[in-house]
Amino acid sequence: MSTHSNDYFSASSGMVSETSSEVSSINSSQPVSFSKASIAAPVPCSDLHSTKSNDASRKLSISRTLTNRLNDIKKAVDDDNLQTEENSADVNKILESRFDVADAIRLQHNESVQSKLNIPVTHTTTAGASLSAPSSSAFSASSIQNDTTEHKASMDSKLMRNRLYPASTKHSGKDLEAQGITEFEPDEPTVKKVFTNKSTGQLELPPDGGYGWVVTFCVFLTMFSTWGCNASFGVDLAYYLNHDTYPGASKYDYALIAGLTVFLGQLLSPLVMALMRIIGLRTTMLFGDAVMLAAYLLASFTTKLWQLYVTQGFMVGCSISLIFVPATTVLPGWFLKKRAVAMGVSLLGTGAGGVVYGLATNKMLSDFGNTRWCLRIIGISCSISVLVAIALLKERNPTPAIGLKSPRAMFEQLKAMFSLKVITKPFVVLIALWFMFALFAYNMMVFTLSSYAISKGLSSHDASTLTAILNGSQSIGRPLMGLAGDKFGRANVTIVLTTLLTIYMFAFWIPAHTFVQLIFFSILVGSCVGVANVMNTVLIADMVKPEEFLPAWAFVNYCGAPFLLVCEVIAQALTVEKDKSNPYLHAQIFCGCCFIAALILISILREYSIRMKLTERQAMTNEKLKEWKASEYDTDSADEDWGKLKERKTKYDLLLGPGIKKYFLRMVYPMKV
């Protein structure tokens, strides 16, 4: 067996040292004398040609060194990306990389039932459900156990099993083996734990289509009528600020109402998720729809400021969370491989709703001269569209509600949702901080754009048009973000988009004064400003284990919610009305600084993610090297594989080395992550 020592890092180190020696030799040469005599003395032509030749050879050598260095880096990155692509067909890897709240709920429910029964769960694959080679080994015939009848359960467990698994209790161990039924093991893949139908004991993978597209349309409607409608509040805010609608109200009051809806929408998400597990999905959404209708209708009759706080602030915020959170849990049950596409289509609702309700709100305000009929029409239209979504929404494998009869079961749901163990994981805290800064800047920019346009001398119609363009760009940008994240890496895409947003805030928004300039700004920013909303869930899935996903998701939502409450209040406090040239300059700078903070945090998260992935691959490489040493191969292919493993070992040892230089090297290492 021969070994290859020409790995890329050792070669590159030699090249860099060679370059350094050449540069040092140039720097250590005799200094040039600039005396009059030396200037006047003629230089022989042969010396000039020799000097030019030496300079050219040095430049050529440096150029070759850099070229070889870049080629070696490209080779290393391609090797890592190839290893990532090798797992792209593994259904279990796909699920873990796209893990969602609905998957976490099903996993929690299945494990809860399993612990209560204290019996092995039976699994069988349905027709058409296929796994890739890495996952299918768990379901092969060799994993089937013949002695399932040897398990001794209590009488209560037997009775519950007869109710849940009537088919499996009618067969002997040999009959179960013939059906392809296996016992549940602790190290089973996540896809088996999540998509096992508890009523039949069968593994049922999502169909990636069919009625799932109707469900996608339903989620689109809920996003259209909740966050999409709320995105048009910037038009209402501009109207309230420019008209004395509620005597005695300050700009901070209206700003606080704007922040209240976003604050409650994020803060209540974990509580709504627990409520849905207790009373059921449809009941929760119907309750939220009723609250929404009442909120807008009551807001249209308000005459005092506190009434507006209660209706358009508190009640609307609660209704948004009660409607959209349960709806988003249905979609993952219908899609797995096409989940990013389905999620992207459903997210179109936020941007589309902002366009429609933004333009409609401005039109109704100009026609009616007040917000009364505007709020009534919005409330009725939103509640009807949500009712349509509830009627058509269908869970593929519904998780039964636990009901109100068991306080202990309800407490267990809250305990699982608000587990404080996730705080001990620093990367979860980093995700929460990143999400807070990015969402803070997003809301500040969205709610301020309309008022900023009016301060620059534009009409209210132009201001609402800018808001509509911004939301329309979001409807295109958000689906593309999800697809780009799956192709190029979530952290990579997030860093690129956050960098662009930082540039747009400082280099485009501040100098933009005309309507045309603000149109282009709205298009550019709208295409990438929703990056936090799109990427927060998948980044959590990349960082935590499936069993820890639910409390981590809850923590990310409620951790940054209080800051969203005062988001627009801070924007108004930073406004300098005496500065006629640009009263929102300080708010714009603060918004850009928030994106800078988000960029720093996501860069730290990227380094951590790369370190985890490289550490895992380093361990796998070392294990394979041990296996190769223990075995004997004398073929060309074996020799080639040995060389590749040695190159990988050297690469991982270098990248995972200690020191600040290695830390930043991992941070900028251009692999898909």
Curated annotation (Swiss-Prot):
One of its GO terms (molecular function) is transmembrane transporter activity. InterPro entries: MFS, MFS_trans_sf, Proton-linked_MCT. Glycans are attached at residues 230, 471, 492. It is a multi-pass membrane protein. Residues 1-208, 277, 337-339, 394-426, 526-549, 606-673 are cytoplasmic. It is found in: Endoplasmic reticulum membrane. Keywords: Endoplasmic reticulum, Glycoprotein, Membrane, Phosphoprotein, Symport, Transmembrane, Transmembrane helix, Transport. GO terms for cellular component: cell periphery; endoplasmic reticulum; endoplasmic reticulum membrane; mitochondrion; plasma membrane. Belongs to the major facilitator superfamily. Monocarboxylate porter (TC 2.A.1.13) family. This is Uncharacterized transporter ESBP6. It comes from Saccharomyces cerevisiae (strain ATCC 204508 / S288c). The gene is ESBP6.
